[in-house]
Structures are given as C-alpha cells and as structure tokens.
C-alpha cells in the first residue's frame, strides 16, 4: 500500500506510536537522518526503546565511516548526542555499491542486535544509494533480511518511484512517500569529505597503541608468501572472538614487522581487511582492491 503524507511530524508521531521496524530511503540530503531523529524523539518520549541503525557507511552519525552503527535510545536527550555506538559492524568501504553483501549483512545483523538488546522500535537510516542496479539491489536485499513493516521514501521529485514500485511488487510493506525535509541543508562534496575525515579522526583518538599482529589473524586469510608491505596503511576492522567489531585499526609495516594501530586493542582476536588506505595526517582515504593487494591482479 502506498500512502502520501504531507507532514513529516505527523508521520513521525504515527510511526513512533505504532511501528516496530521502519526503513528510511532517500537520496543525498533528503532528510533521512532528520526524520529518524524525529521518530526517535517521539518514541522515547512515549517510553519506548529505540534501536537506531545508521547504515550510511560514508557519512555515518553513529560510529565511524566504513561501519554500520547502532545505538539504543531510551531518552529524548540521547537522540542528538554525539556518543559511541552500542554496536558496530565493519564493512570496510565508503561506497556501499562496491560491497553489497557486506552492507546488507551488516545492517541486518545490527537490526537483530537492537531487537535482542530490548528495542521495541528499530529505525533504519539507509545509504543514499537509491538508483540503478546497485541501489535497487542493495535496498531489495535489506528489505529481504530486515523485514520492516513500514518504509518511508523521501524525494525531491519522482526519483524514488522505480525503487518504490520494485519494493511493492516483491514485499508486503506499507510505503509512505514524503517530500524531502525542507530544513535540511544541502552539503557540498567538500563538506561531506570534511565530515568523513572528522569521523575517522574520532575513531583514531588517543590513547592509540601499536599491536604486533601475525599474518594468521586476518579475514580474508592472507595468501602464503604475501609481501606484508602491501598491507601498509590499510584500514581494518578490529574484532573480538564473538563476531563483534570493537572499532577501527590501521595496519603499519616496518622493518619486516606488521602492526596495527588502534585504540580498541584490548580483547582483539582478529582483523577484517578493509578496501581503503588511510592517511593519518589528513584522514583522507584511497580505495583499493583487496584482490590487487593480495594477488596483484
């Protein structure tokens, strides 16, 4: 069923009172995060526990870039806080269309963790990748695994119609279509890059430590005979032994020794390789192919 609602606040109040899982869709700067916060404020004010899942791996508001993050909210005052994520899932890229499988699994796993932690409303703030094969594939599989009963599509014109049509053909879901939030400022590419760099800078805040690592601790597994220097400056997800991401790290190779620089080394059991190199001076990133890093092809 398709519903057109003119008031963002009206819909936020309705979802806060009735919904259990809501997925927000929209292109850049359409107000997904703003609406997510409206819903969370209204729901927590009514005594509900909200699991906010931020699946925007480029400019995340929960956790660092390259990760899907989740926070459990019980009070309206928590909604706008800059606070550590209660759970992270490392994806390892800034472009969700490059690693669709990892993106979908990361989002679905944190939706499940939010429910297990006691959330009676989960709000999924998705990426701005909404068009073409990549956008539709990403959203189709997120719908398939997360199973929201309400979807909100924010649009400036009619750009969301193809993806809305696809979701309604394949899923029994109520879709609400709203115009883009009028108060949302359009950010320039430079502003987005600055926000991304600041998020990575926070992820590598002091106290940082170097931990010597063995070639056997990685996923995917390193090929035999790999020149470890090829891993220098690669971004990694630091994982415990329970399938949970503790935070980010950066590999450093010097004098034949491989180390990881991180502030979450306690409890570290394994490292997941990302598809980015990180410059710690500027916190700018450069995409890389793991196939090329490992096999030179």
Regions found by a protein language model. Name each.
Residues 2-25, 46-47, 51-122, 130:
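Nucleotide-state-sensitive switch-loop elements of NTP-binding domains
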Residues 1-17, 24, 42, 149-297:
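Preference for solvent-exposed, low-hydrophobicity sequence contexts
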Residues 35, 39:
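Hydrophobic positions on the alpha1 helix immediately C-terminal to the Walker A/P-loop
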Residues 32:
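Conserved lysine of the Walker
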Residues 41, 57-61, 140-142:
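A generic local secondary-structure boundary/capping motif
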Residues 28:
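The conserved Walker
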Residues 113-173:
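Phosphate/Mg2+-binding loops and adjacent switch elements
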